[in-house]
UniProtKB/Swiss-Prot annotation:
Family: Belongs to the MAPEG family.
EC number: 5.3.99.3, 1.11.1.-, 2.5.1.18
Protein name as it appears in the record: Prostaglandin E synthase
The organism of origin for this protein: Equus caballus (Horse)
Site (Essential for protaglandin-E synthase activity): D50, R127
Record function comment: Terminal enzyme of the cyclooxygenase (COX)-2-mediated prostaglandin E2 (PGE2) biosynthetic pathway. Catalyzes the glutathione-dependent oxidoreduction of prostaglandin endoperoxide H2 (PGH2) to prostaglandin E2 (PGE2) in response to inflammatory stimuli. Plays a key role in inflammation response, fever and pain. Also catalyzes the oxidoreduction of endocannabinoids into prostaglandin glycerol esters and PGG2 into 15-hydroperoxy-PGE2.
Length: 153
C-alpha cells in the first residue's frame, strides 16, 4: 500500500500551507540576497573587515537603500514567522479546504505586494494596505485556534 500523501492526511489545507510557506521563505532568501547586492553596489558594509576587503574603512557605513532592504527583511521576520506557526496549527484544525487556501493565498499575496512596495519605494499607502491585508488571515487563524483550544479545556 502506498504511503498516504499530504492531501490524504489533512485534506487540501496542509499542501496549500506548505506551498505558500515555502514560497515565502524563498522570498525572504531573495530579500537577503538583494540586501547583499545593494551593499556591494552602494559600497556600504556593516562590518569593518568587509569594508577593508572592498576598498577601505571609509565604506564601513550606513546607506538608506541598504537600510530599506534590512527593514523589509525585518518586517518579513515579524510577520512570516508567526504565519508559519498559525498556518500549520490551523491546517490541522480541519478547516474547509477552500477557506484555508484563501487564508494562505491572501497572506502570500499581501506579503509579496508588501515587499515589492517596500523595495520599489511605491507610494503610500500601498505598503501599509498590503501589510494590513496580509494580517487579516493571520488574525482569523489565531482566533480560530484560540477558539478550538478553549473548547477543549
Amino acid at each position: 500500500m502506498p504511503p498516504p500523501s499530504l492531501a490524504m492526511v489533512s485534506g487540501q489545507a496542509l499542501p496549500a500551507f506548505l506551498l505558500c510557506s515555502t514560497l515565502l521563505v524563498i522570498k525572504m532568501y531573495a530579500v537577503a540576497v538583494i540586501t547583499g547586492q545593494v551593499r556591494l553596489r552602494k559600497k556600504a558594509f556593516a562590518n569593518p573587515e568587509d569594508a577593508l576587503r572592498h576598498g577601505g574603512l571609509q565604506f564601513h557605513r550606513d546607506d538608506q537603500d541598504v537600510e530599506r532592504c534590512l527593514r523589509a527583511h525585518r518586517n518579513d521576520m515579524e510577520t512570516i514567522y508567526p504565519f508559519l506557526f498559525l498556518g500549520l496549527v490551523y491546517s490541522f484544525l480541519g478547516p474547509d479546504p477552500f477557506v484555508a487556501q484563501m487564508h494562505f493565498l491572501v497572506f502570500f499575496l499581501g506579503r509579496m505586494v508588501h515587499t515589492v512596495a517596500y523595495l520599489g519605494k511605491l507610494r503610500a499607502p500601498t505598503r501599509s494596505l498590503a501589510y494590513t491585508v496580509a494580517q487579516l488571515p493571520c488574525a482569523s487563524m489565531a482566533l480560530q485556534i484560540v477558539w478550538e483550544a478553549a473548547r477543549h479545556l
